[in-house]
């Protein structure tokens, strides 16, 4: 299961590691999109809006958990790179202790706050009840969602990106089947979507734990589960900035959703659908971020920083190539693509406008995501937090607000606001990268 990524062709390692990661993201995004697609076939705009708003809240929570788990991926990868198996086991054990404790706390806190969350999201009145149902069920399933994601992060830190792909495939198939049963046969609406998502992840967790136990894929002693200050500090030092970074990104999306919600039900539904589509189109940038983090960390742990930099270069080039192709294609198929998720023609038109602007973000994000992965691999995840925070505060949110105010007839400028934020992030990343290289050069010469 453990794989050494510090030898051989860097490009080959990037491709071989990122492909299973890409397929994992594809499957995960597929079952996220399935909720919207299936409910759109059986329910009206209000239910579609409820699922889009509820799933956005859950997506925000999930990406923050995954961001926090980056500390585990990098710590395990660095230990694997230097051949320190005991350190890797300690990192795995402390990761389990930290995240399962956190999941229990989140379960109770979020259940208490679910009404306030729906209010803060400026949920249209017609969608309030469905959104509450969706969030209540998903919050109850938080321990499964957490376990589902940390198991994947542990495997990837060990250099294994294939096992998580298999576990996610199980969740995807189960989710789609349950969605049709709960929403199509039983007509449970948004509650059915939440049940399908939560139960499918629970099934995936149970199966993954059974496989791990049967094949003894991970060796963790009881002592490894005891909190160790030095291990916890490293997990949190890397993970917290990434979690905050991802949280701020999602907050900016939530604010944009709130702005769209205040424009009416049509624009609210359009933005919700496009967010799901963008999640699919961001598969390459997202997989490159995680690939650079894992491969870069192993090589840095092995004392081969030049291979980590080469990993960054190849990842950015691959992401840019795919991003350019997506930008070109979407200009011709944006409206029909949105129309697959709704029978409402007005929603399809508005969504097409938003997507044509937003899609530029997939090109720019490919570069800044690769940089973020590199900074995490170096243990400098604070830089990733900084450039995302600045882009949100200075570009994304103000840009979306001004676009909504001065262009009330179209969502195109709002989409461009997000892309502008990523372009700004690239500028900050390039400056930070140059400073890091200069300091490393001086350290070698001095």
Question: What residue spans do the PLM features occupy?
Answer:
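Short runs within selected transmembrane alpha-helices of multi-pass transporters and secretion channels
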Residues: 138-156, 164-172, 193-206, 286-289, ...
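Transmembrane helical elements of multi-pass membrane transporters/channels
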Residues: 16-32, 137, 171, 200-204, ...
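Hydrophobic residues within alpha-helical transmembrane segments
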Residues: 19, 23, 54-57, 97-101, ...
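Short alpha-helical transmembrane segments in multi-pass integral membrane proteins
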Residues: 1-18, 76-141, 185-240, 296-361, ...
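Small-residue hotspots at the loop-to-helix junctions and early N-terminal turns
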Residues: 43-56, 135, 194, 265-280, ...
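Small-residue-rich hydrophobic transmembrane alpha-helices
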Residues: 48-108, 145-164, 257, 270-328, ...
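Signature of the first transmembrane helix
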Residues: 12-73, 77, 240-260
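Helix-terminus/linker motif at the lipid-water interface of multi-pass membrane proteins
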Residues: 30-49, 118-125, 181-188, 247-280, ...
């Amino acid at each position: 299961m453990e794989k050494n990524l510090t030898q051989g062709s860097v490009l080959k390692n990037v491709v071989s590691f990122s492909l299973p990661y890409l397929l994992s993201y594809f499957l995960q995004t597929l079952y996220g999109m399935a909720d919207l697609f299936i409910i759109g076939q059986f329910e009206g705009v209000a239910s579609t809006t409820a699922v889009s708003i509820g799933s956005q809240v859950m997506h925000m929570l999930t990406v923050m958990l995954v961001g926090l788990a980056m500390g585990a991926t990098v710590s395990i990868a660095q230990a694997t790179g230097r051949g320190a198996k005991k350190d890797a086991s300690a990192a795995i054990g402390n990761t389990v202790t930290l995240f399962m404790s956190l999941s229990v706390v989140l379960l109770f806190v979020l259940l208490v706050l679910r009404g306030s969350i729906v209010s803060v999201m400026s949920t249209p009145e017609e969608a309030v009840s469905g959104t509450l149902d969706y969030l209540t069920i998903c919050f109850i399933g938080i321990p499964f969602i957490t376990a589902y994601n940390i198991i994947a992060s542990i495997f990837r830190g060990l250099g294994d990106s294939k096992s998580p792909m298999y576990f996610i495939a199980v969740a995807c198939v189960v989710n789609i089947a349950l969605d049709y049963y709960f929403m199509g046969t039983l007509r449970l609406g948004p509650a059915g979507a939440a049940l399908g998502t939560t139960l499918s992840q629970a099934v995936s967790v149970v199966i993954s734990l059974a496989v791990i136990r049967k094949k003894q894929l991970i060796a963790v002693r009881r002592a490894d589960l005891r909190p160790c200050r030095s291990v916890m500090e490293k997990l949190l030092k890397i993970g917290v900035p990434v979690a905050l970074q991802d949280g701020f990104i999602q907050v900016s999306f939530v604010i944009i959703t709130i702005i769209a919600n205040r424009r009416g039900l049509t624009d609210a539904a359009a933005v919700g659908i496009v967010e799901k589509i963008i999640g699919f189109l961001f598969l390459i940038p997202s997989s490159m971020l995680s690939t650079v983090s894992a491969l870069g960390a192993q090589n840095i742990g092995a004392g081969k920083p030049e291979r980590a930099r080469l990993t960054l270069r190849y990842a950015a080039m691959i992401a840019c190539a795919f991003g350019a192709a997506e930008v070109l294609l979407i200009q011709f198929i944006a409206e029909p693509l949105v129309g697959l998720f709704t029978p409402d023609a007005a929603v399809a038109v508005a969504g097409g406008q938003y997507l044509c602007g937003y899609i530029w973000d997939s090109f720019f994000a490919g570069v800044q995501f690769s940089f973020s992965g590199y900074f995490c691999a170096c243990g400098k995840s604070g830089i990733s937090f900084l450039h995302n925070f600045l882009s949100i505060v200075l570009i994304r949110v103000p840009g979306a607000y001004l676009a909504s105010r001065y262009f009330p007839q179209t969502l195109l400028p709002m989409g461009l606001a997000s892309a502008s934020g990523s372009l700004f992030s690239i500028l900050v990343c390039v400056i930070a990268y140059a400073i890091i290289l200069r300091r490393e050069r001086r350290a070698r010469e001095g």
